[in-house]
């Protein structure tokens, strides 16, 4: 080995590696478990002068700068879950940590890692089948169900009053319905069509939904109108000015009148473009590129409102909101590419001015979030994104399960029944999987301020008597017989993703029995440069 690896390389093998990796996972588990559930505590993330206070799992893991490869694997797993379903990031790290914690007990009993891995995989497959049997199919058009799902998602957030929470829930649902596409009985919610604008100043209760797009730009000329109604809209990806050629040229001018002639030609070129825009009946011109002063003046003179240097993402949203196609050149522009807006006006938001482009048929909308400072508006944005994702998941897979740990406890109960049919030591892994799910429920009760042992024994008893939806009512710190009655529901898609990802991460870590840490490359000494001042 001394001749095989570079000097200074460190190598660990066997159970020592597995147990070390499990220890790392348990540290992450301890860090995140207090943030689990609606009553989970916040974390303060400090980076330089930036401070973030949140209990949002995705934000916490994205801001973690971990060094150990096992920790990195778990963090990447959480990020993947966030990308796939937009929720469950805390849950997946906690559950993976619990699965590894239970696996450690089996390893100490001399159970081989391969047996544990195979048992966990079989338990996962059983869990996914059981989930489908437990879940209830719903209609995505049932607003009450959608309301309850969003309520569950947002109940763990910072909203101060029930009135504020209800207002935000309805805002989220209305925004989702506005951009929802329905084709052949299926639904598609593209969250990218919902723009969130954060404004410092005002109360959170003043947040509002705009049927259209709000752009942080003002008209390019002060003589342009500040408000127009029922107008044609043109979107462009070209500048409104005389463009420079790719070939460098010099003009030889011998007479001052030649300068005037050149400027007149430039004005005539731009005027021709503005005249075409006017002839098409355009009253709002928006481009991703520049608009020169001559064009701005001429458009203002003709009562046309114009915006320049608008972000590509906003241009695409405006296309969805107004129905306008994005013209790539003035030559290709025609009336059939124009869109419509019911109202276009400049408004003040906080200390800045924004342009509101509204339409009754908008397929892209804007949610304006107001709050006293950046921390509040940033956390609100994260909360709304979670809510939008919960609706998207429900549309993709219209099944729900009871929340508050009810589904995890029911799975644990049924897995133990299935474990009796498993032959050999894999039965122990089956039961360990069930124990991890129950431990998850125990943590949920603990973050709600309950005694975890008492809570677990009570919820276990209720499920044993057939109350499959019994769970933890965190608002009153009690075990309730039917969480569906309390409007506490979760999306089946999120639960499936959390189970899959947590199990995959745990089994991947259990498969590692050799870790080789290469020694850092030795830096070659730099040759000393002669001092020119010495002889």
Curated annotation (Swiss-Prot):
PROSITE patterns: TCP1_1, TCP1_2. One of its GO terms (biological process) is protein folding. InterPro entries: Chaperone_TCP-1, Chaperonin_TCP-1_CS, Cpn60/GroEL/TCP-1, GroEL-like_apical_dom_sf, GROEL-like_equatorial_sf, TCP-1-like_intermed_sf, TCP-1_chaperonin, thermosome_alpha. GO terms for molecular function: ATP binding; ATP hydrolysis activity; ATP-dependent protein folding chaperone; unfolded protein binding. Keywords: ATP-binding, Chaperone, Nucleotide-binding. Pfam families: Cpn60_TCP1. It comes from the Archaea. Molecular chaperone; binds unfolded polypeptides in vitro, and has a weak ATPase activity. PANTHER family: CHAPERONIN. Forms a Heterooligomeric complex of two stacked eight-membered rings. Belongs to the TCP-1 chaperonin family. This is Thermosome subunit gamma. It comes from Saccharolobus solfataricus (strain ATCC 35092 / DSM 1617 / JCM 11322 / P2) (Sulfolobus solfataricus). The lineage of its organism: Archaea, Thermoproteota, Thermoprotei, Sulfolobales, Sulfolobaceae.
């Amino acid at each position: 080995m001394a001749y095989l690896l570079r000097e200074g390389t460190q190598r660990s093998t066997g159970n020592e590696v597995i147990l070390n990796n499990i220890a790392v996972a348990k540290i992450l588990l301890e860090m995140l478990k207090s943030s689990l559930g609606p009553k989970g505590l916040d974390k303060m993330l400090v980076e330089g002068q930036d401070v973030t206070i949140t209990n949002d799992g995705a934000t916490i893991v994205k801001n973690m700068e971990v060094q150990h490869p096992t920790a990195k694997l778990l963090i990447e797993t959480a990020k993947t879950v966030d990308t796939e379903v937009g929720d469950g990031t805390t849950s997946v790290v906690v559950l993976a940590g619990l699965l590894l914690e239970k696996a450690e007990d089996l390893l100490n009993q001399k159970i081989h890692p391969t047996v544990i891995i195979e048992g966990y995989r079989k338990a996962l497959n059983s869990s996914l089948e059981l989930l489908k049997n437990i879940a209830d199919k719903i209609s995505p058009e049932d607003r009450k169900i959608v309301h309850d799902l969003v309520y569950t998602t947002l109940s763990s957030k910072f909203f101060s009053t029930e009135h504020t929470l209800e207002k935000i829930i309805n805002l989220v649902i209305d925004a989702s319905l506005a951009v929802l596409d329905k084709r052949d009985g299926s639904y598609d919610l593209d969250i990218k069509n919902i723009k969130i604008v954060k404004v410092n100043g005002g109360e959170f209760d003043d947040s509002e939904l705009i049927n259209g797009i709000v752009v942080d730009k003002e008209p390019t000329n002060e003589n342009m109108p500040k408000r127009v109604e029922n107008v044609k809209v043109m979107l462009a990806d070209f500048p409104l000015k005389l463009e420079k050629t790719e070939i460098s040229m010099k003009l030889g001018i011998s007479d001052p009148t030649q300068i005037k002639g050149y400027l007149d030609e430039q004005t005539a070129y731009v005027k021709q473009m503005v005249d075409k825009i006017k002839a098409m009946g355009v009253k709002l011109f928006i481009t991703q590129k520049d608009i020169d002063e001559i064009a701005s003046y001429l458009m203002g003179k003709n009562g046309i409102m114009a915006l320049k240097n608008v972000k590509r993402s906003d241009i695409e949203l405006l296309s969805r909101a107004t129905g306008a196609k994005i013209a790539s050149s003035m030559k290709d522009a025609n009336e059939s590419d124009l869109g419509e807006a019911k109202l276009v006006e400049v408004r003040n938001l906080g200390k800045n001015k924004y342009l509101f482009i509204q339409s009754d048929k908008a397929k892209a909308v804007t949610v304006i979030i107001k709050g006293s400072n950046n921390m509040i508006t940033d956390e609100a944005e994260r909360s709304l994104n979670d809510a939008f994702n919960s609706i998207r998941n429900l549309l993709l897979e219209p099944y729900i399960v009871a929340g508050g740990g009810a589904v995890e406890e029911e799975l644990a109960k049924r897995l133990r029944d299935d474990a009796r049919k498993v032959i050999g030591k894999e039965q122990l892994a089956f039961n360990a999987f069930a124990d991890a799910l129950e431990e998850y429920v125990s943590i949920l009760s603990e973050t709600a301020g309950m005694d975890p042992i008492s809570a677990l024994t009570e919820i276990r008893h209720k499920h044993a008597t057939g109350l499959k939806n019994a769970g933890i009512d965190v608002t009153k710190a009690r075990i309730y017989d039917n969480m569906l009655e309390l409007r506490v529901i979760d999306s089946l898609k999120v639960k499936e993703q959390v189970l899959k990802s947590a199990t995959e991460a745990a089994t991947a870590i259990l498969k590692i029995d050799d870790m080789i840490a290469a020694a850092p490359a030795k830096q070659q000494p730099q040759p000393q440069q002669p001092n020119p001042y010495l002889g």
